[in-house]
Amino acid sequence: MTNERKEVSEAPVNFGANLGLMLDLYDDFLQDPSSVPEDLQVLFSTIKNDDSIVPALKSTSSQNSDGTIKRVMRLIDNIRQYGHLKADIYPVNPPKRKHVPKLEIEDFDLDQQTLEGISAGIVSDHFADIYDNAYEAILRMEKRYKGPIAFEYTHINNNTERGWLKRRIETPYKVTLNNNEKRALFKQLAYVEGFEKYLHKNFVGAKRFSIEGVDALVPMLQRTITIAAKEGIKNIQIGMAHRGRLNVLTHVLEKPYEMMISEFMHTDPMKFLPEDGSLQLTAGWTGDVKYHLGGIKTTDSYGTMQRIALANNPSHLEIVAPVVEGRTRAAQDDTQRAGAPTTDHHKAMPIIIHGDAAYPGQGINFETMNLGNLKGYSTGGSLHIITNNRIGFTTEPIDARSTTYSTDVAKGYDVPIFHVNADDVEATIEAIDIAMEFRKEFHKDVVIDLVGYRRFGHNEMDEPSITNPVPYQNIRKHDSVEYVFGKKLVNEGVISEDEMHSFIEQVQKELRQAHDKINKADKMDNPDMEKPADLALPLQADEQSFTFDHLKEINDALLTYPDGFNILKKLNKVLEKRHEPFNKEDGLVDWAQAEQLAFATILQDGTPIRLTGQDSERGTFSHRHAVLHDEQTGETYTPLHHVPDQKATFDIHNSPLSEAAVVGFEYGYNVENKKSFNIWEAQYGDFANMSQMIFDNFLFSSRSKWGERSGLTLFLPHAYEGQGPEHSSARLERFLQLAAENNCTVVNLSSSSNYFHLLRAQAASLDSEQMRPLVVMSPKSLLRNKTVAKPIDEFTSGGFEPILTESYQADKVTKVILATGKMFIDLKEALAKNPDESVLLVAIERLYPFPEEEIEALLAQLPNLEEVSWVQEEPKNQGAWLYVYPYVKVLVADKYDLSYHGRIQRAAPAEGDGEIHKLVQNKIIENALKNN
């Protein structure tokens, strides 16, 4: 394949429609430079020193009136800006445009003779050396902007990017395929369509979400990966929904036909997994439908050894987009070093394939594209391909969006958009070429709208003519791209018609041979679907001990700043108190300091940490202060970049005001780099439900469905403190409902030292078969509560404890109160004011897995126990009560009374009035501590 391209440089100046005015101003400048604005003085000084410019401009001006030039410029601008509306991008059923701006020569009272008398340089600054006159140049522009690729880039604000695109698009350029390459491209299409036809014939009615109508997607991906290989990009991350997924798996990731057909036959596909280990396919114990599954292929098929990953995906359209971005960033980051990670955008690139109805319809796309240029999230440019079959299930565009194109939503992110006819395979390749060049040059996203159609219904059991009869009359008559391109090659004499049909038949034979290798009797019929033995136990404590001096060295380093760094005095007083646990007998380590010490020791162990959230650098509640700001210069300093003997990076970023995309990004990052301790912190836990799709469809079910492991940690501020229904509850009950098969750890802590040991335990589990998500109902007011803060000796040894008890005399206890988090602290402080040895408070630090054995062992030590109470802040239908009740009921059996104390059932999580909150909270505490 050769690319014939004439390079041209941009002229020093192009005044366009303002030519007449600028010449007048130039004359004024020659007489008196100070008579024109300063910026024009600089420009005119440059022009004055170039003898070739002004005479050419004056020649054009003298031959043509300013009015003529203005009309020419208006025509040119319209072609660039609106030519896409008349482009040949629709293989079938072109839309009827009601309002199209003027785009023809005649519309501007111009003709060939007039235009032939005007310099081509007026049309475009780089045309002067290519075309003889404006007429030739405009014909070129019409062909270019109204051809099989429709270009939209005039909305881009950056002049350099816009100018680059203009030159790249308008410079004569042609992708020239030799005959062998054309044959190879035809064969690619024949395999793509032949695969679909075979499945359609042999598995009638089976859902496969056919690619037919946008078949060119596969050669476009192959072209993209080949270009990436030449650029040295060795990690390709692909995200897509179900449409065309099976074809991409087989023809891009090279999943054997035998494996794919086995899945349709419900036999074991893993028997056909390549023995060379080049294809990685993980599976969970409950599994998922075939068109949700992904895989990883290591191959040199595209020019160099590359790792090509197709992300697993639920049916929730577009939600995989931020996951793919996170996976890509993880592949780009070097985290095995001290300080912050270094990011190399040439290591990996993301390709995200969207649907035309879902792309403008799903808000996750807005959130994800907003990450594109942010320091903590950029991946150096994503390639977005819209598989535009111009319908969503049964909904047509008129009911699906309020814009001309499904891609219009991308304009707000200053990215170029190319619409390309899916039946013009060579045009689709050129669109990829331009997109990849732009990404390489500017490290920004590009959107390609692959405009085609959908051969069948939404799925293969659906009849589209019920709701879309007219379009499908034309689609049924329309040849597939395999035949469109094949006939083109026949007409060009590249192949004969017999060769075309012979190869199409050969594809069917190859598929039949693969099919015949499968034993129909080898059914997968195990209904038990047991979780792996590695998940039999809860998160195990990391009981590494530390000397006092070791932790003091870390603490001192975290409180040492560069010379001349000016910390706000008010903040400095707070930070200086962190010396007290090491300098004073009664010094205590609060929550934030416990976290800093844990992070530092984890970094020393070689585990990188990445923490993001809307205010995570400081902390919503002004407690963390992980990034310090010089009060005079604004410069920043991150102490955790300077830990003694640090072996891994600490990366912290304030996130955009987004939950779903940011959590999806962190999930993807951790899936790709399982050694990374990824933490997402909600501003308030109440806002976490904006990420519910990520929780439901990825984080808590991915291992069961796909065998995909994640150790993402969530910090969700949760406590009832009179701040109303939207600043009180992280919806603990929802996470407990998602908890099963040891798929996560859910905690609500009351001790800073237990928090320290928990973080270390989670870090130790990463990149092991025991890794799993961690959900922390993190504190708010407890961040500074002295009851939560602990002495340093609780940090030097020990490990995470699932329950904590107060000191007690066993034979005096008649009532046990089980509580968690702030509720436990409130009860403890109330009991301290009115001591009662008959009441034993037990902090349930780990809610899932529920600590049955620990509680059972404790209750067995209390010979006079009469009552067990569960006490919570949340309403009865929320919080942990409905989850813990079956466990506690079994433990209590008929030996003790069981009672509940908390808010009554409520539709909203909390009261809106702070004073009423206090009354209700005090009543709960009073009733709970009352000894019947």
UniProtKB/Swiss-Prot annotation:
It catalyses: N(6)-[(R)-lipoyl]-L-lysyl-[protein] + 2-oxoglutarate + H(+) = N(6)-[(R)-S(8)-succinyldihydrolipoyl]-L-lysyl-[protein] + CO2. GO terms for cellular component: cytosol; oxoglutarate dehydrogenase complex. It holds the Pfam family OxoGdeHyase_C. PANTHER family: 2-OXOADIPATE DEHYDROGENASE COMPLEX COMPONENT E1, 2-OXOGLUTARATE DEHYDROGENASE. E1 component of the 2-oxoglutarate dehydrogenase (OGDH) complex which catalyzes the decarboxylation of 2-oxoglutarate, the first step in the conversion of 2-oxoglutarate to succinyl-CoA and CO(2). Homodimer. Part of the 2-oxoglutarate dehydrogenase (OGDH) complex composed of E1 (2-oxoglutarate dehydrogenase), E2 (dihydrolipoamide succinyltransferase) and E3 (dihydrolipoamide dehydrogenase); the complex contains multiple copies of the three enzymatic components (E1, E2 and E3). This is 2-oxoglutarate dehydrogenase E1 component. Its cofactor is thiamine diphosphate. It is an enzyme of class 1 (oxidoreductase). Belongs to the alpha-ketoglutarate dehydrogenase family. It comes from the Bacteria. GO terms for biological process: glycolytic process; tricarboxylic acid cycle. GO terms for molecular function: oxoglutarate dehydrogenase (succinyl-transferring) activity; thiamine pyrophosphate binding. Keywords: Glycolysis, Oxidoreductase, Thiamine pyrophosphate. Its EC number is 1.2.4.2.
